[in-house]
Curated annotation (Swiss-Prot):
Keyword Transmembrane set for record: yes
UniProt GO BP: ATP synthesis coupled electron transport; electron transport coupled proton transport
Protein name (database record): NAD(P)H-quinone oxidoreductase chain 4
Function comment: NDH-1 shuttles electrons from NAD(P)H, via FMN and iron-sulfur (Fe-S) centers, to quinones in the respiratory chain. The immediate electron acceptor for the enzyme in this species is believed to be plastoquinone. Couples the redox reaction to proton translocation (for every two electrons transferred, four hydrogen ions are translocated across the cytoplasmic membrane), and thus conserves the redox energy in a proton gradient.
Keyword Translocase: yes
Catalytic activity: a plastoquinone + NADH + (n+1) H(+)(in) = a plastoquinol + NAD(+) + n H(+)(out); a plastoquinone + NADPH + (n+1) H(+)(in) = a plastoquinol + NADP(+) + n H(+)(out)
Annotated transmembrane regions: 11-31, 43-63, 95-115, 119-139, 143-163, 175-195, 217-237, 251-271, 285-305, 314-334, 340-360, 382-404, 425-445, 472-492
Length: 538
């Protein structure tokens, strides 16, 4: 071997994976271009692929899945007078999502091949967003997290405002108002936690914050603000309305970034900050997360069923599936929380595949209205096969990743003895409604697109060519891990199970403290303690 293993293990892989695509983006304006954008497309693809290979190398050369603690850690003094340091690292919560980010971005660059309007700006934004999103999962400082969180807002805003559909300005403005406005809660909570001790220099590092003995009232206040901020990004109903509008106007590669990566930032942040750094507040808020998860599943599934616009139908389907992430995070079992983590990875792959196919179908039919489609299966048989495979993955067909992740959440929550049995039965029964609705609206969607009576006007005007090799390759790259995880989930769960176990143990200790307090209150007053805490009493 040319490079010794110790050097590879201590190589700054994460910093390289963050700055390489950002520096690559800065070079994009200087790429020679003959007017067709061919050169910049290949350049962006090479940069994105190298970034993906860097994250893969980080996993295999510097990351041990059996270890619970932080790995690949780098810390450099940045602005010491303000208590700011450049610190990055990875554990089981972040490493799978770092890999997912670089993988989806590489495919999004390939999906953006047909972009001809301002291609340099488009690929500049994709590469810059790649580095920013990896930073969200890799940084170990709350102020750095806030900066990385904000960095990805502007590329998405420009994607929507410049390359979006007819209502692009409305969708872009709504996106920036929701996400930038809610980000203020992250900044306020981060400053409050960093300055908690008072007197000395603030410390915003995750490790330092996890060791602080925050008061319960302080935790509840910070938890509430962070829940709003991360709930917008997840999204949680009723903070979700920006997402259908954004998806309704976005192009295929932007769809892939939104569904594949952006929504996962909210789920990751709930685990990293709310569950890990604020355990006492999480023990009290967890039942609310469960209820919100059920609302997400049922409301979004019913709304998706009623949608006649293809993009909005898939957008609401995404919101429904993210409800399982909320239930898993709200559970106090390693199996349930592990299922939430797997659901984020699974949905990232499945959501990216479905939205890419939506874009590919629109490029041919020039319509998103299901009422205007029908009977195109005879002309696009390979496209129909790709749609069918991805729809089956979304409806959680056994043997695919969606099935095992949702099953883990269900079983983990139902067997979680922290909650009372009646509460578990009611939640499981209601969530099952969403599981039943999903195949109904997805299979009916396939029927309306590909079967039934042909729309003569559509058939005569549209270029109904079948899937091209580039499109087949993108879907194949997404289906391989979807099926691989579905058949052998340990390949993914082993990556983060040690970190999940440590997180759940910390939260269970908080549950015991809450139970002790509740027992004291009940013995003294013999009164109900309220609906949020009641499910904790078993």
């Amino acid at each position: 071997m040319l490079i010794p293993e110790p050097i590879l293990a201590h190589f700054p892989w994460l910093s390289l994976s963050i700055f390489f695509p950002i520096v690559g983006a800065l070079i994009v304006p200087f790429i020679p271009d003959k007017g067709e954008g061919k050169e910049v497309r290949w350049y962006a693809l090479i940069i994105a692929l190298i970034t993906f290979l860097i994250t893969v190398a980080a996993y295999f050369k510097g990351f041990d899945p059996s270890q619970e603690g932080l790995q690949l850690y780098e810390k450099v003094s940045w602005l010491p007078d303000l208590g700011l340091t450049w610190s990055v690292g990875a554990d089981g919560l972040s490493m799978p999502l770092i890999l997912l980010t670089s993988f989806i971005t590489s495919l999004a660059v390939l999906a953006a091949w047909p972009v001809s309007y301002k291609p340099k700006l488009f690929f500049f934004l994709i590469l810059a967003m790649d580095g920013g999103q990896i930073a969200v999962f890799a940084v170990q400082d709350m102020l750095l997290f806030f900066l990385a969180w904000e960095l990805e807002l502007f590329p998405v805003y420009l994607f929507l405002a410049i390359w979006g559909g007819k209502k692009r300005q409305y969708a872009a403005t709504k996106f920036i108002i929701y996400t930038a406005g809610s980000s203020l809660f992250i900044l306020l909570a981060g400053l409050a936690m960093g300055f908690f001790q008072g007197g000395g220099m603030p410390d915003f590092g995750y490790t330092h914050l996890a060791q602080q003995n925050f008061g319960k009232g302080f935790q509840l206040l910070c938890y509430s603000g962070l829940l709003i901020a991360f709930g917008v990004k997840l999204p949680i109903v009723p903070l979700h309305t920006w997402l259908p509008d954004a998806h309704g106007e976005a192009t295929a590669p932007v769809h892939m970034l939104l569904a594949g990566i952006l929504l996962k930032m909210g789920g990751y942040a709930l685990l990293r900050f709310n569950a890990q750094l604020l355990p006492d507040a999480h023990a009290q808020f967890a039942p609310l997360l469960i209820v919100l998860g059920v609302v997400n599943i049922i409301y979004a599934a019913l709304t998706s069923f009623a949608q006649r616009n293809l993009k909005r139908k898939i957008a609401y389907s995404s919101i429904s599936h993210m409800g399982f992430v909320l239930i898993g995070i709200g559970s106090f079992s390693s199996l349930g929380t592990s299922g939430a983590m797997l659901q984020m990875v699974s949905h990232g792959l499945i959501g990216a595949s479905l939205f890419f196919l939506v874009g590919a179908t629109y490029d041919r039919t020039h319509t998103l209205q299901l009422d205007e489609m029908g009977g195109i299966g005879q002309n696009m048989r390979i496209m129909f096969a790709l749609w069918t495979a991805c729809a089956f993955a979304s409806l959680a067909l056994p043997g695919m990743s969606g099935f095992i992740s949702e099953l883990m959440v269900f079983v983990g929550f139902v067997t979680d003895e922290v909650y009372t049995l009646p509460f578990r039965i009611v939640v499981a029964s209601l969530a099952a409604i969403g599981v039943i609705l999903t195949p109904i609206y997805l299979l009916s969607m396939l029927r309306e697109i590909f079967f039934g009576k042909e729309n003569a006007k559509l058939i005569s005007k549209a270029k109904l060519v079948d899937a091209e090799p580039r499109e087949i390759y993108i879907i194949a790259c997404l289906l391989v891990p979807i099926i691989g995880i579905g058949l052998y989930p340990k390949i993914m769960t082993d990556t983060y199970i040690s970190s999940i176990d440590g997180l759940v143990k910390r939260d269970l200790l908080a549950v015991e403290r809450i139970r002790s307090d509740q027992t004291t209150i009940i013995s003294n007053s013999n009164l109900s303690i309220g609906t949020i805490e009641a499910p904790l009493l078993d």
